[in-house]
């Protein structure tokens, strides 16, 4: 049966079970949008900018475990999703992104809105291709969905020239494809895993390090059972937070640059680091020569390229976290770690996350109230100080989830990602935790949130600064606050120490801004008003509510380890 490329495109999405697509139209994809108009099975979301669009798809994918799907036009439409592709690449988020392209005969002629988007994104996609023959379209789309969600998940880009969309001929959407050279890991090498487990049994001070791979493979329950059976304490990376309940007695906390004192000390003093689903990012290791100096290291990861790339390990195991843990559970036996846990409890008495209550609203207070008022929720953060406070203080269990930008650290990620998460989970509370800097990077998505009727609670921590950079300037750059004050004007004196009486009070006024979009806005300056603001936000299920928390400009995220230093060198006060 003859079928056009545009019809095959929509049929492919339906066959893959796609129920939502985030798309922004343009000249080279008008045919595809016209075909989407005719189907009732796919919800087409119109964002206000392509970067917002791809972050919304990330939020959708992270909150569901399904593939996020994007559709944008050629040229600037395509280049605007590059940051999101990189973000998804580093955080292993399954996306299939379709870009329009000029007709085949114009490729290479510098045609209007022609860019080589496949070439531009080759290093940040699992697979990228320009469709050259209409009869290949179905096979390529099938490959894209398979590649995006198998092995180490990630983004795939399919570039579809305009004439491929309109060409007609015989074609079917395949039920499966064989991809030469692509062999994702499904099993586990039992011999290597037994070596790793034998090492665990002989250790006196074992420690499990759980990364984002545990969450990606939905292996949190298996990890919880394993650590309980073995009686071994656990630390997590930021991306691994939530893999086990944060209130569990064997859970110590996040480790790394802004990790908990006890968690970092446990890494530094353990004699076996049993790592699962982490790539040993520099924010976790600090000085590689001083990382886990007394430990033998086991590394279980589905990505062969991650093994021994940053940290040379003693026992490598290439496997999905869930598959490895399932086998480990068959062997698990309780071991005596009482003395080791006593040492950890002594470190925990340092109370490196102590809360300040001596000067207005502290960020820690806000997180405490979020825990009380929004349990069992999806928490989405942007990037900056607020992100670290959230990862330090939010309590997570099996019914809650933390979504954040870890590998790329993308400011502007949080708000659109929360929209995508809410669209995917309309009945679940979604709390966006953001700052006055990051929120303004994709503030136009307020229109998307309002038109989609997403009742998101936006906790905006406003310190009038790019707070994380300001913190580095305070601690390491002699308090020279260069280009970090968000209220600074040309008339401000050189060497300005921060907002003063001559500065405009609000830039912008987030309450009025919310109202101008048809959303809700509340400003909170006292702790006693926090719960009332949350109660008001819960009433608004038809549109987002911005709760602007006015916090001190000089709040610091502590502990902190200077980049490149050993994780034992924590700044605590």
State what each model feature region is.
Residues 1-332, 369, 378, 455-458, ...:
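N-terminal alpha/beta PP-like core and its mobile active-site loop of ThDP/TPP-dependent enzymes
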Residues 2, 50, 109-110, 183-197, ...:
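A general structural motif
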Residues 6-9, 14, 19, 32-36, ...:
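Active-site diphosphate/adenylate-binding microenvironment
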Residues 29, 50-55, 386-388, 526-530:
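Short acidic loop-to-helix transition motifs that present clustered carboxylates
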Residues 107, 112-113, 308-310, 316-318, ...:
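Thiamine diphosphate
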Residues 124-127, 178-179, 345-359, 495-496:
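Short glycine/proline- and acidic residue-enriched helix-loop micro-motifs
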Residues 153-156, 334-347, 546:
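Flexible, glycine/charged-enriched surface loops at secondary-structure junctions
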Residues 159, 380-382, 548:
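Short beta-strand segments
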């Amino acid at each position: 049966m003859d079928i056009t490329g545009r019809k095959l495109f929509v049929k492919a999405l339906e066959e893959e079970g796609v129920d939502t697509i985030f798309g922004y139209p343009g000249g080279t994809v008008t045919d595809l949008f016209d075909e989407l108009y005719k189907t009732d099975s796919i919800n087409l979301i119109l964002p206000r900018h392509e970067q917002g669009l791809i972050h919304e798809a990330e939020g959708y994918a992270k909150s569901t475990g399904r593939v996020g799907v994007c559709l944008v036009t050629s040229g600037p439409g395509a280049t605007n999703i590059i940051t999101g592709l990189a973000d998804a690449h580093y955080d292993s988020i399954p996306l299939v992104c379709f870009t329009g392209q000029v007709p085949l005969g114009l490729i290479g002629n510098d045609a209007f809105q022609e860019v080589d988007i496949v070439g531009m994104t080759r290093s940040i996609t699992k697979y990228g291709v320009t469709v050259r023959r209409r009869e290949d379209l179905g096979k390529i789309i099938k490959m894209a969905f398979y590649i995006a969600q198998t092995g180490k998940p990630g983004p795939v880009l399919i570039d579809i020239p305009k004439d491929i969309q309109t060409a007609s001929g015989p074609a079917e959407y395949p039920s499966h494809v064989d991809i030469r050279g692509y062999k994702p890991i499904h099993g586990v090498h039992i011999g290597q895993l037994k070596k790793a487990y034998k090492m665990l049994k002989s250790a006196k001070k074992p420690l499990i390090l759980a990364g984002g791979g545990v969450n990606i493979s939905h292996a949190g329950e298996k990890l919880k059972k394993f650590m309980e059976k073995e009686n071994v304490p656990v630390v997590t990376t930021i991306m691994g937070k939530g893999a086990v309940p944060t209130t569990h007695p064997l859970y110590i906390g996040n480790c790394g640059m802004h990790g908990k004192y006890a968690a970092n000390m446990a890494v530094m003093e353990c004699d076996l680091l049993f790592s699962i689903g982490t790539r040993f990012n520099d924010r976790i290791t600090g000085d590689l020569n001083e990382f886990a100096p007394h430990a033998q290291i086991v590394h279980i990861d589905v990505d062969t390229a991650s093994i021994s790339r940053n940290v040379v390990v003693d026992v490598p195991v290439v496997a999905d976290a869930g598959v490895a843990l399932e086998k480990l559970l068959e062997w698990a036996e309780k071991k005596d770690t009482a003395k080791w846990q006593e040492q950890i409890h002594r470190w925990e008495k340092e109370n490196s996350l102590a809360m300040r209550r001596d000067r207005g609203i502290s960020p820690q207070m806000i997180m405490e109230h979020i825990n009380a008022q929004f349990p069992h929720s999806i928490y989405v953060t942007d990037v900056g100080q607020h992100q670290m406070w959230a990862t330090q203080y939010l309590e997570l269990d099996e019914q809650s989830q933390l979504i954040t930008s870890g590998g790329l650290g993308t400011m502007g990620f949080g708000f659109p990602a929360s929209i995508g998460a809410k669209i995917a989970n309309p009945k679940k509370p979604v709390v966006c935790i953001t700052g006055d800097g990051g929120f303004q990077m994709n503030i136009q998505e307020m229109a998307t949130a309002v038109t989609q009727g997403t009742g998101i609670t936006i906790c905006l921590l406003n310190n009038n600064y790019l707070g994380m950079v300001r913190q580095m300037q305070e601690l390491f750059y002699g308090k020279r606050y260069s280009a970090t004050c968000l209220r600074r004007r040309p008339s401000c004196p050189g060497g300005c120490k921060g907002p003063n009486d001559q500065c405009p009070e609000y830039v912008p006024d987030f309450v009025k801004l919310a109202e101008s979009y048809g959303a809700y806005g509340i400003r909170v300056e006292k702790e006693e008003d926090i719960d009332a603001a949350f109660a008001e936000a819960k009433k608004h299920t038809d549109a987002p509510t911005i709760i602007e928390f006015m916090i001190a400009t000089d709040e610091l995220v502590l502990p902190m380890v200077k980049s490149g230093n050993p994780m034992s060198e924590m700044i605590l006060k």
